[in-house]
Each structure stands twice: as structure tokens, then as C-alpha cells.
Amino acid sequence: MTIGNFRPATVLIDETAILHNIQHEVARLKKQTQLFAVVKADAYGHGMLRVARVAKAAGATGFCVAILDEALGLRKADYSEPVLVLGIVPSQYAAIAAAQTISLPVSSTEWLEQALPVLEAQPELPPLRIHLALDTGMGRIGFTEDQALKTAVAFVEAHPKQFVIEGVFTHFATADAPDDTYFKQQVNKFNHLVNLLPSRPRYVHVSNSATSLWHAACNGNMIRYGVAIYGLNPSGDAIPTTPFPLEPALSLESELTYCKQVHAGDGISYGVTYRAKGDEFIGTVPIGYADGWLRRLQGFHVLVDGQYCEIVGRICMDQFMIRLPKAYPAGTKVVLVGQSGDQEITLLDVAKYSKTIHYEIACNLTPRLKRQSVNPVD
């Protein structure tokens, strides 16, 4: 997708906020515990390479991504730190990961059996580093049964030139919820499955951001620090208190490209779902659903000159309209996410109106929106 460098629409990334969010967590870690920065999905829309650079400066010792392509992107950018892919990678690409010392998750012996000939065909490669995924209640990927796990471990031990168990992990479904009943059930199942292993691998990890913030007593020597890097509370506001203040790193700003006066009954946008109730000033903002500012945000608001202005009419692919309190010239700043005067719109505000989570809003901001760092970290 082409980046819109020549229109007034910018995602601003506060690098110092990212630095502080990581440094505060690193300072809380138990001795010998490492922090891997989760930079999947272009670092939740914040820019993978930008965040990786700041995370490394803040004390992160490795990275987690969702797909092999993201891991290769880090290697191409000369990041030599450990990189763990969290999603299942098709077995035919196992040699690519091994050649780049990229760690992959394993959820079945079948995957190992399929990857074996791929790795045997290139005997010069180091063993593929694998992390055994344990499904303790997320229902996504991972071993669930004792015997299946034992069989996989035995297979790996029988092929030491092709595989090495570097880690074991699980993912919690409710670590961000006030009720920890299900969370504790998952902890118990994880401990049971880990105890089946002949020895503990280098990395034993269960902690995502929510677990690290609110359940620090969990066993493990590595945390997968994700959404909190970006200053977002993993629970939304279900658990409003965090051990330290999280500093939001992302804001979204634009400008008015056009302002006009309309009169009672005049229609706005597709379907004429909004008609002026009287003489009104309508401003046009050059962002639309192709940028991730979705149609469901009709009726929400943005900030102009420190005042909330309602989005009126349907949001178009590339533009939307707002009702202004008075006439403003083209070029007037419009804040979609962030502060203006004494007022603020957060990603969580946008998410609540959209009936979703703030993770999704950040990730939906498309590459067409140019990214720009503020408060840069050297």
C-alpha cells in the first residue's frame, strides 16, 4: 500500500513512552528473568523496526512475532537477538528458520515428522530451536494430553541434529480479567505438563503483558511483553490499576481540508444518513476506512481546537465529515487519537464506541497512514 506522504494524516509514535513502558517492567522483573518485546503485526501498528530499536535500548533481550516473515524482517535489519515466532509455521519452511536461528513453536509430533526431512536435506544447518506450545485452556495451539507431549519430546531427543528444545510456553485466556479462577486452572495444568519434561529448557514462559503486570508470581524466566509496551492497559479498564503508569505511545492527527456552511435539511455523505438541523459548519478530514478509521465510527467524535466535534454522515473510504462549532480554515489541526487542549481521545475510547478492543483499533491503522516518531530515543 502506498504511504500517504503528501496528505495531512499522521500516526505519531512517542518513542520515549515506549522506552519508559519497557524500562519500568524490566525494573520489576525477578533476577534471571528476560523480557522479549512482542513486535508482531508491525508492533501493533507502531512500526516493528522502530519499536525493536527502542525496546533493545530499554532492556529487551529478544523479540516475539506472529509469522516467520516478521522474524526474517528483524534478521534482515541486523537484529541478532533471539526471535520467537508465536504462530505455527508450515513445516516446509523449517530450514529457513534454522538457518536464521529463529525459534518456532511446536504443537504436534506430526509437525516434527514433516519438518524432519526438510532439515535432514540441509545437514549443515544448526538444529532448529523449538518451543513446545502447551494448550492449557486458550484452545488455540499446543499440546493438551500427557502422552502426546511425551511422544513429541521423545521424537526430538531421537533427532538431536535436527531439533533442540529451547523453550516451553502457554498463553492465558483470562489473565486480564478480575476473576482469576480460570487463570489458576491454566497455571495448574501448565505446571503439570512441564513436570512431564525430562528437564527444563532454557526458556519457560507464560507471561504476556497482563500476566506480568498482575500475576508476577507465576513461574517462568521470560515474559512476552506486548500491548503494555505501547501504553495500553491489557484489560481495557476492567482492571484499572497497573503497577506503574502506562504511557500511551500512539496518537493520530490530521487537518481540515475543507470547511463549508450548510443549511437545515442539507444531507451529508453516502445514504444521506445525516441532515443538518439548521445552519451548520461542516469540515472534511482526509482519513477514511481505507486507513482503518472504520464506518462504525459514525457518530463518534474528534477534537478540533480542544473541542469535541461529532462525525456526521457515513465515513467514506478516504474522507469523513465533522460538525464544527464555527468556521475553521483548511489546515486546522484535527486530533482523532490524542490530546487537544484539556481534552483527550484514547484508543480505548475509540474501541468502546466501536464495540471492540484497543488492540484492534491500533492494528487496523493501515500503512497508508504515514508514521512519524516524536520524542525519539537514540
Swiss-Prot record:
<protein>
    <recommendedName>
        <fullName>Alanine racemase</fullName>
        <ecNumber>5.1.1.1</ecNumber>
    </recommendedName>
</protein>
<dbReference type="InterPro" id="IPR001608">
    <property type="entry name" value="Ala_racemase_N"/>
</dbReference>
<dbReference type="GO" id="GO:0030170">
    <property type="term" value="F:pyridoxal phosphate binding"/>
</dbReference>
<dbReference type="GO" id="GO:0009252">
    <property type="term" value="P:peptidoglycan biosynthetic process"/>
</dbReference>
<dbReference type="GO" id="GO:0008784">
    <property type="term" value="F:alanine racemase activity"/>
</dbReference>
<keyword id="KW-0663">Pyridoxal phosphate</keyword>
<dbReference type="InterPro" id="IPR000821">
    <property type="entry name" value="Ala_racemase"/>
</dbReference>
<dbReference type="InterPro" id="IPR029066">
    <property type="entry name" value="PLP-binding_barrel"/>
</dbReference>
<comment type="pathway">
    <text>Amino-acid biosynthesis; D-alanine biosynthesis; D-alanine from L-alanine: step 1/1.</text>
</comment>
<dbReference type="InterPro" id="IPR011079">
    <property type="entry name" value="Ala_racemase_C"/>
</dbReference>
<feature type="modified residue" description="N6-(pyridoxal phosphate)lysine">
    <location>
        <position position="40"/>
    </location>
</feature>
<feature type="binding site">
    <location>
        <position position="140"/>
    </location>
    <ligand>
        <name>substrate</name>
    </ligand>
</feature>
<dbReference type="GO" id="GO:0005829">
    <property type="term" value="C:cytosol"/>
</dbReference>
<keyword id="KW-0413">Isomerase</keyword>
<feature type="active site" description="Proton acceptor; specific for D-alanine">
    <location>
        <position position="40"/>
    </location>
</feature>
<dbReference type="GO" id="GO:0030632">
    <property type="term" value="P:D-alanine biosynthetic process"/>
</dbReference>
<dbReference type="InterPro" id="IPR020622">
    <property type="entry name" value="Ala_racemase_pyridoxalP-BS"/>
</dbReference>
<comment type="function">
    <text>Catalyzes the interconversion of L-alanine and D-alanine. May also act on other amino acids.</text>
</comment>
<feature type="binding site">
    <location>
        <position position="317"/>
    </location>
    <ligand>
        <name>substrate</name>
    </ligand>
</feature>
<feature type="active site" description="Proton acceptor; specific for L-alanine">
    <location>
        <position position="270"/>
    </location>
</feature>
<dbReference type="Pfam" id="PF01168">
    <property type="entry name" value="Ala_racemase_N"/>
</dbReference>
<dbReference type="InterPro" id="IPR009006">
    <property type="entry name" value="Ala_racemase/Decarboxylase_C"/>
</dbReference>
<dbReference type="Pfam" id="PF00842">
    <property type="entry name" value="Ala_racemase_C"/>
</dbReference>
<comment type="similarity">
    <text>Belongs to the alanine racemase family.</text>
</comment>
